[in-house]
């Protein structure tokens, strides 16, 4: 393999010499072939730079982009302004959906199954194929089949496209399919992204007011600033990530170069999708049209959906989640509190319009939610009789008094542990005092923000005719931004940090280090900056009402004082007075001639390099075991039926489906695997045959066709079949060999395929990619083990060993993601089966699935019940 890699690198070395001193290497995701990627250019240069070679598609794309302006002029002259606006709005929506849904689906399947790459390999699109039929491929250039003619055309066209745009030194046959597929994929990305941008710009241009008075104002100035900032973000992002990340290169192959993240990547997470769309809002400000703003919000929101469902899953699967042990300190403290205090439960937290961690047995939760419901209901029923001036005073006084109360508690707690001492002196515990503080702080936030929402809503209702729709939408955007900031803050510092846990439980802190995870990577005190933007959003929504400005100033000042004079001194006392430079600060410092590379960037860089996937190339040897005449799906059903009818007696000696040692063992106690031996006549065998595991009570007397789903409890009979169904259904194949008369193999169903329910089961051998049953095994029993419950230590030992074998134990905690068939209900049944005690799912989630806590808690409950008996 190493010699192949060296040869390939030498063959493509001449193409990459233009990179100068940058020695960039890459490797394919699955086959692990190393190569040097060719020189590529950004979208604008590729399409419009006359000094660069242009392919046919690039010429067509450039022509299509330019034609939009001529079409706009013609439609405007023929049908008028309004029709032209909606005409290009529809076009923009089409291209935006093509971007986020179309490209999203393509990248999703490429990420999971390498669909585009496998398609290119299957149809030999980038291979040298002679004019006669290739002995190792179904591809034939002389065939009269429409499908083969189609793929022959695709092959020639794709090769022509690459040759016409790449330098003469570029030998497409020397490169792996991944890089060639990526180069073709870029062409369609260019078309969609450029059309998306141009149609949006034309729609915005047609929406700009004609009056100079409406254009030259503070909104236009702010809009131009946002547009210029947006341009810088895009340019700086491309400077950092280059074409490789710009065109989603890691969905196709992985570069092994050192990644440098600076500039705009220190300002915001995913800058190309977050602050990289501020230009949308700048153009909306210039137009002063709420319809343009709504279209911009739609485009931006759809981009976030693309990020959430396409890019983020791929990044986590490829590079890992990027979370180190230090950044999880607060989360571990929360786990430790739950572990050491059985009566402790996670506090109720208000996030936006939802409540998290509601406990139906905790009265304070009902009191908090009841307060919100009573205030809202009272407002709705008495809206006409509420005096806004009195309500303003109520909101102002409530905020000020409650903030003074909260600040006093935190200040005295920091100085002398006053709040904790108060409870300890009255017979309560330290954790109990912390729980009461959690209720007080959350109630303070809920009460003040509920009153603010009520007051703002009544303000808008009473002056709705004077409210600008664009201002209303921008205000809601700021509210959404604050909600996002709160969620990101809580995600980064966990419940312990959100509720100022280091004021009350500093003895639980093992590492004196502030987190730099999540939003804290970019801002030192996000709650002081973004934590009040939603309140200023209410100022916009109420058309700059004086009372709302006063409330916004009050919120800002109280927030600033709390952070500056109470929180910061306490943090310095606990963690040490260290100056931490935020990502934004590093970027500002980086504008100087000497750029500074942050520690955070180095950590991300190391994680990315260490997490590069090194998958071995899938073997193709299994498919060669069988004659190709038996792989024709079109004649397969007829072949099976004829064979079953005419030669059943002759073939019966070669039909076998037996469980190993079934004469000795008919009851398999989990996690013991079940090994199955099968034999099938060569005339009946199909590479897509598969074996499913079923409950006997579900299949019943239907012996010819299985009418219930396998639910994932199935295995292929050959490792070369079902390529798009993951490795789990092929790794179970441990043996397969073929003779002139029959094919036989061995399949092992381990804990990744077995049921975790007591019952009687059977295996069914199915023909091809169907549910037609050819063979049925002898019924057998699967049962959960009975763990040793003599002592809590032995019970814990057996439980952890079992969960480890089932692959659902990580760091001593139950993690059902490791085995989709062993969930919370299975764990409950295992414990009940062993010790006779049933723990609730809610409790096990509350202790974060800690095996030590769960086993000892179950054993303690058993002892208590025995003593009561």
UniProtKB/Swiss-Prot annotation:
One of its GO terms (biological process) is methylation. Its EC number is 2.1.1.17. The modification N-acetylserine is found at residue 2. Residues 77-86, 209-212, 280-291, 384-390, 461-463, 556-869 are cytoplasmic. It is a multi-pass membrane protein. PROSITE patterns: SAM_CHO2 (PS51598). It catalyses: a 1,2-diacyl-sn-glycero-3-phosphoethanolamine + S-adenosyl-L-methionine = a 1,2-diacyl-sn-glycero-3-phospho-N-methylethanolamine + S-adenosyl-L-homocysteine + H(+). It is an enzyme of class 2 (transferase). Belongs to the class VI-like SAM-binding methyltransferase superfamily. CHO2 family. This is Phosphatidylethanolamine N-methyltransferase. The gene is CHO2.
């Amino acid at each position: 393999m190493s010699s192949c890699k060296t040869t390939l690198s030498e063959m493509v070395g001449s193409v990459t010499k233009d990179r100068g001193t940058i020695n960039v290497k890459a490797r394919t995701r699955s086959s692990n072939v190393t190569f040097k990627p060719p020189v590529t250019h950004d979208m604008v240069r590729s399409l419009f730079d006359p000094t660069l070679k242009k392919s046919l598609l690039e010429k067509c794309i450039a022509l299509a982009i330019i034609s939009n302006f001529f079409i706009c002029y013609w439609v405007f002259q023929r049908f008028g302004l309004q029709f032209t606006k909606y005409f290009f709005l529809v076009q923009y929506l089409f291209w935006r959906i093509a971007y986020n849904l179309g490209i999203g689906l393509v990248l999703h399947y490429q990420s999971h199954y390498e669909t585009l790459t496998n398609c290119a390999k299957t149809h030999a699109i980038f291979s040298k194929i002679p004019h006669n039929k290739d002995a190792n491929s179904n591809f034939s250039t002389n065939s009269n089949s429409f499908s083969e003619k189609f793929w022959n055309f695709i092959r020639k066209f794709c090769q022509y496209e690459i040759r016409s745009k790449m330098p003469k030194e570029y030998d497409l046959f020397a490169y792996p399919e991944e890089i060639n597929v990526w180069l073709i994929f870029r062409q369609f990305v260019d078309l969609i992204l450029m059309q998306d941008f141009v149609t949006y710009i034309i729609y915005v241009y047609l929406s700009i007011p004609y009056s100079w008075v409406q254009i030259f104002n503070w909104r236009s100035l702010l809009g131009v600033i946002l547009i210029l900032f947006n341009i810088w973000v895009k340019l700086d992002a491309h400077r950092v990530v280059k074409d490789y990340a710009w065109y989603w290169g890691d969905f196709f192959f992985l570069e092994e170069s050192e990644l440098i993240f600076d500039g705009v990547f220190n300002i915001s997470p995913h800058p190309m999708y977050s602050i990289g769309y501020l230009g949308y809002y700048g153009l909306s400000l210039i137009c002063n049209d709420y319809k343009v703003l709504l279209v911009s919000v739609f485009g931006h929101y759809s981009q976030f959906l693309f990020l959430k469902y396409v890019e983020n899953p791929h990044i986590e699967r490829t590079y890992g989640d990027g979370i180190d042990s230090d950044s999880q300190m607060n989360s571990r403290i929360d786990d430790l509190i739950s572990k050491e205090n059985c009566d402790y439960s996670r506090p109720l937290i208000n996030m936006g319009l939802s409540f998290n961690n509601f406990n139906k047995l905790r009265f304070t939760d009902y009191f908090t939610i009841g307060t919100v419901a009573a205030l809202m209901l009272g407002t709705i029923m008495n809206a006409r009789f509420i005096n806004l001036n009195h309500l303003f005073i109520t909101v102002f006084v409530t905020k000020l008094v409650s903030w003074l109360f909260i600040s006093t508690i935190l200040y005295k707690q920091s100085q002398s542990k006053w709040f904790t001492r108060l409870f300890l002196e009255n017979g309560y515990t330290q954790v109990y005092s912390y729980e009461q503080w959690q209720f007080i702080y959350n109630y303070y936030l809920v009460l003040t923000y509920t009153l603010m929402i009520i007051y703002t809503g009544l303000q808008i209702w009473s002056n709705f005719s004077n409210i600008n729709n664009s201002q209303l939408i921008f205000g809601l955007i700021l509210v959404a931004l604050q909600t996002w900031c709160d969620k990101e803050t809580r995600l980064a510092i966990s419940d312990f940090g959100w509720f100022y846990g280091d004021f009350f439980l500093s003895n639980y802190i093992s590492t004196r280090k502030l987190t730099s995870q999540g939003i804290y990577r970019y801002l030192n005190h996000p709650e002081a900056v973004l934590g009040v933007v939603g309140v200023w959003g209410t100022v916009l929504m109420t058309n700059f009402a004086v009372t709302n400005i006063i409330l916004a100033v009050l919120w800002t000042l109280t927030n600033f004082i709390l952070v500056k004079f109470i929180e910061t001194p306490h943090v310095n006392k606990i963690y040490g007075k260290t100056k931490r430079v935020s990502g934004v600060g590093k970027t500002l410092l980086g504008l100087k001639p000497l750029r500074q590379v942050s520690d955070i960037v180095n950590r991300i860089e190391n994680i990315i390099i260490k997490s590069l996937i090194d998958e071995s190339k899938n073997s193709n040897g299994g498919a060669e075991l069988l004659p190709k005449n038996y792989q024709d799906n079109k004649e397969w059903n007829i072949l099976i039926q004829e064979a079953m009818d005419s030669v059943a007696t002759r073939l019966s000696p070669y039909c076998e489906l037996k469980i190993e040692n079934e004469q000795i063992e008919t009851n398999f106690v989990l996690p013991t695997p079940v090994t199955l031996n099968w034999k099938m006549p060569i005339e009946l065998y199909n590479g897509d045959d598969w074996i499913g595991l079923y409950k006997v009570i579900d299949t019943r007397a239907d012996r010819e066709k299985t009418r219930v789903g396998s639910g994932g409890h199935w295995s292929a009979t050959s490792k070369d079949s079902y390529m798009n169904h993951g490795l789990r259904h092929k790794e179970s194949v441990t043996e397969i060999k073929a003779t002139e008369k029959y094919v036989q193999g061995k399949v092992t169903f381990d804990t990744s395929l077995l049921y975790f329910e007591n019952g009687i089961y059977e295996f069914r051998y199915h023909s091809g990619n169907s549910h037609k049953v050819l063979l049925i095994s002898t019924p057998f029993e699967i049962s959960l083990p009975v763990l040793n419950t003599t002592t809590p230590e032995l019970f814990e030992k057996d439980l952890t060993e079992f969960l480890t074998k089932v692959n659902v134990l990580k760091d001593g905690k139950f993690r059902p993601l490791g085995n989709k068939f062993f969930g919370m209900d299975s764990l409950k049944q295992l414990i009940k089966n062993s010790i006779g005690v049933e723990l609730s799912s809610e409790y096990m989630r509350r202790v974060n699935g800690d095996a030590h806590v769960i086993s000892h808690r179950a054993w303690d409950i058993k002892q208590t019940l025995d003593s009561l008996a």
